[in-house]
Amino acid sequence: MIQLDHVIYGTSDLEAAADRFGTEFGLTALPEVGRHPGGTANRCIAVGGTQYIELLTPYGEGAIGHWVRRRIADGDGWLLWSVTTDALEFEAARLGLEITEGRVTHQDGTVGSWRSAGSTHREVTRGGLPFWVCYDDPDGTRPEIWGRRLAETDCGMPLQGMAWLEVGIARPELQRWLGSDAAIPVRAVNSARDGLLRVAVATPEREIVIS
């Protein structure tokens, strides 16, 4: 099954970005700062289920950190989006993608790991297409963990996941990438700017739209 997983917002200042999401949108970032070997650090905002918004900033040296630094040279903004699948090998083979491994070190010393495909593809790094991810979760505890994380945030309203994404990309290209059976709430639009444009988080009473 293919499902929307998370979206990535690039920032030069994690704390300032977390404050902005809290003040403007009522979305509370988790306090923990994760650090990645590729030269980035993050804070996450749980938005329902296992979905989340990742605030990502360059940290130290590393190829990914340098890429993020270039992308946000003109200001903070949306970078990437991802989908999760339990058939990563199949999707990677179908699209001719290499599978790579990733990990994050949490502040308590534990390490989270995953495998992904497509994160270096040109159309993905422009933000139009999603990269694929499959988490290492042998005990099946990931939904429970994200449930606790959501409970830790004080947003003042129930969050029900991402209602939709708006992406500047041609719909046939997106359909070819995801496959005809994928039911992902993505609006492909004609835009002067490629990539992720807007994200809507669902609540019982309204949608929180973030540009």
Give the ranges of each region predicted by the language model.
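Amphipathic alpha-helical segments
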Residues: 15-28, 90-95, 170-181
